[in-house]
Design a protein with these regions (language model features):
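Short, surface-exposed ligand- or partner-binding patches at beta-edge/loop junctions that are enriched
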Residues: 87
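Rhodanese-like catalytic fold shared by cysteine-dependent sulfurtransferases
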Residues: 2-8, 13-42, 51-83, 92-129
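Structural scaffold elements adjacent to functional motifs in cytosolic proteins
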Residues: 44-46
């Protein structure tokens, strides 16, 4: 019995280091997301189409369309160690973008849970420039 316990303990120790280097993204409500975007060094990433972006986006947001054929090439140019606040219209595309970013090695990712729709419903500012 002691031998079995020792084998299990050693196996658990060695296998605990096998889980990948992924951190879960965090889904935030509009107010929390706004606070996150105002933190120093956080990059706000709008993954909607350019047409959606020009109709109204968060201040200082960078636009990279997750559904364009260039998304992976564009995110490859970004700093993987930076913190990103990612949003779209409803939260679906931003979650897809976050999953792709995780697969590319990004670890500090925050999602606007219900997208810019939630942001606007909360009365938070959008810009069109």
């Amino acid at each position: 019995m002691k031998k079995l316990f020792a084998i299990i303990a050693v196996s658990t120790f060695f296998l605990s280091g096998c889980g990948g280097n992924f951190s879960a993204s965090t889904n935030l409500g509009a107010q929390e997301f706004q606070a996150k975007t105002q933190e120093s060094g956080v990059i706000t990433l709008d993954v909607r189409t350019p047409g959606e972006f020009v109709s109204g986006h968060l201040v200082n947001a960078l636009n990279i369309d997750v559904e364009s054929g260039q998304f992976d090439a564009e995110i490859a140019k970004l700093d993987k160690s930076a913190t990103y606040a990612v949003y779209c219209r409803s939260g679906r595309r931003s979650q897809v973008a976050i999953d792709r970013m995780k697969n590319a090695g990004f670890t500090n990712l925050f999602n606007l849970n219900a997208g810019v729709q939630e942001w606007a419903a909360a009365g938070l500012p959008l810009v069109t420039n």
